[in-house]
Amino acid sequence: MEDRSHKVLLALVMLFLFAVIVLQYVCPGTECQLLRLRALSPAAAADPYRAEDETPARFVPRFNFSAGDLLRRVDFNIKGDDLIVFLHIQKTGGTTFGRHLVRNIQLEQPCECRAGQKKCTCHRPGKRETWLFSRFSTGWSCGLHADWTELTNCVPSVVDSKKEVRLRPSRNFYYITILRDPVSRYLSEWRHVQRGATWKASLHVCDGRSPTTEELPSCYTGDDWSGCSLQEFMDCPYNLANNRQVRMLSDLSLVGCYNLSVMPEEQRNKVLLDSAKENLKRMAFFGLTEFQRKTQYLFEKTFNMNFISPFTQYNSTRASSVEIDEQTQQRIEALNFLDMELYDYAKDLFLQRYQYMRQKEHQEARRKRQEQRKILRAKQAHLREQGENSSSTDYLGNVERWR
């Protein structure tokens, strides 16, 4: 019995070796489809953008956007007068993205960043003026973490004098920003405040003035709010962390700035949310912290500027280390219900833009391949025609000699 099993095993080994020899003979090299199965496997062919941030394989859009809303390609003239303006919302990953802008872009004249200095010099090629308005290039020129209302009213006057405005009417301001999941962002801000951050230097200018203490009371009485518990953080009704992303992206002039008595709360919330959605949609670009590689891809396609090193998805943050129960999670979502709705809208628009741009990219690649095949076929036809003409000439010459 044992001898028989040895014979069977030997036969199987011989059969396997024979199959390998036949395969190599019938299909040598690496061009055989059978040998390419591994290369075509899902693991090897996985989309790097999907693998990086674990996007679901099938994204189903919820909102209807026009082709104009989805296609974002701006003619950014870095050698001219165009300016990229970065709206930096607290605890959205804006610091990381801001560093990418000054240290990680392939430029004819790279930004000059010196050790120990917070700001980099980002001049246009051959000029002594900046192409980037951000924390790491111009500093907080319009106030600490200036919002949409502040930036749109401040940037033009800071960048240009009245005389320059008349001389340069064609300057384009391209606003960009980064958003983050509201619960993660809120927890991150709480941890930051708990460590002593205040952002007291923020101006909150709207309609030409900062809010009064009655319009914007403080959540604490001392120099800062260090050591505050999450419960205390959530209990303050004036906490600017609540719905921060909607507030910083909307036109506050539409609701009377920080004066809550101008209109009913429900109406105010709707106006703010609608304004934030519209401003976000009309921005030249926005990215999402949860999708680093896609953020990089869309920025590169939008501005035709390439980063040197790929973005990295960091899933371990101070916010992710905070363990909260379901009740606390629901409380945070309720406090940030406008941000939750804005983020759903932004995520849908972001992923639709990504899909649209990838489709355009694939269509363009297919068109180029078709053009190349067309040119190749034309060359082959031309060569065949030349060969036929040559054969015909040789034949006629022989006929003449035979006579």
Swiss-Prot record:
The chain crosses the membrane at residues 8-28. Gene3D superfamilies: P-loop containing nucleotide triphosphate hydrolases. It is a single-pass type II membrane protein. 3'-phosphoadenylyl sulfate binds at residues 88-96, 180, 188, 312-314, 318-319. The active site is at H145. It comes from the Eukaryota. Disulfide bonds: none annotated. It holds the Pfam family Sulfotransfer_2. GO terms for biological process: limb development. Residues 381-403 are annotated as: Disordered. Coiled coil: none annotated. GO terms for cellular component: membrane. GO terms for molecular function: heparan sulfate 6-sulfotransferase activity. It is an enzyme of class 2 (transferase). Its EC number is 2.8.2.-. Belongs to the sulfotransferase 6 family. 6-O-sulfation enzyme which catalyzes the transfer of sulfate from 3'-phosphoadenosine 5'-phosphosulfate (PAPS) to position 6 of the N-sulfoglucosamine residue (GlcNS) of heparan sulfate. May also play a role in limb development. This is Heparan-sulfate 6-O-sulfotransferase 2.
